[in-house]
Amino acid sequence: MAEQSDKDVKYYTLEEIQKHKDSKSTWVILHHKVYDLTKFLEEHPGGEEVLREQAGGDATENFEDVGHSTDARELSKTYIIGELHPDDRSKIAKPSETLITTVESNSSWWTNWVIPAISALVVALMYRLYMAED
């Protein structure tokens, strides 16, 4: 059952949130806040199915991956019904770290200057030969 603190914030347990994962009641967690998206299902630009796949669980990573607009973020605030209970916050899987591989640029003056210079020289010679035939 939801608990209330002194600040009138309703806290929901993860177990309670997981019960709301169908089209009659669709709740998701975003940044430890609980959203009731039931009335928004048909209005969602990405389609109802996208929200239903995340229903009853943490949708933070997927929400951020999509790159929602400022308007979408403002609209989402109207669907907040409470927060995930602090005791359950550690139960949510943290997003896996994304490894970014960078390629060190070992390109030398050879590839940056000599090859383009030779290519330009060849094109100039071919042009000159072509013009000489006329």
Curated annotation (Swiss-Prot):
Transmembrane segments: 109-131
GO CC term, one of those recorded: endoplasmic reticulum membrane
GO molecular function ontology, one term from the record: heme binding
Entry keywords, A to Z: Acetylation, Electron transport, Endoplasmic reticulum, Heme, Iron, Membrane, Metal-binding, Microsome, Transmembrane, Transmembrane helix, Transport
Subcellular location: Endoplasmic reticulum membrane; Microsome membrane
InterPro entries assigned: Cyt_B5-like_heme/steroid-bd, Cyt_B5-like_heme/steroid_sf, Cyt_B5_heme-BS, Cytochrome_b5
GO biological process terms on file: response to cadmium ion
Pfam families xrefs: Cyt-b5
Bilayer topology: Single-pass membrane protein
Positions bearing N-acetylalanine: 2
Domain of life: Eukaryota
Residues involved in heme binding: 44, 68
Keyword Electron transport attributed: yes
Positions of the Cytochrome b5 heme-binding domain: 9-85
Residues carrying N6-acetyllysine: 7, 10, 19
Keyword Lyase in annotation: no
Family label: Belongs to the cytochrome b5 family.
Function: Cytochrome b5 is a membrane-bound hemoprotein functioning as an electron carrier for several membrane-bound oxygenases.
PANTHER family per UniProt: CYTOCHROME B5
Protein name: Cytochrome b5
Name of encoding gene: Cyb5a
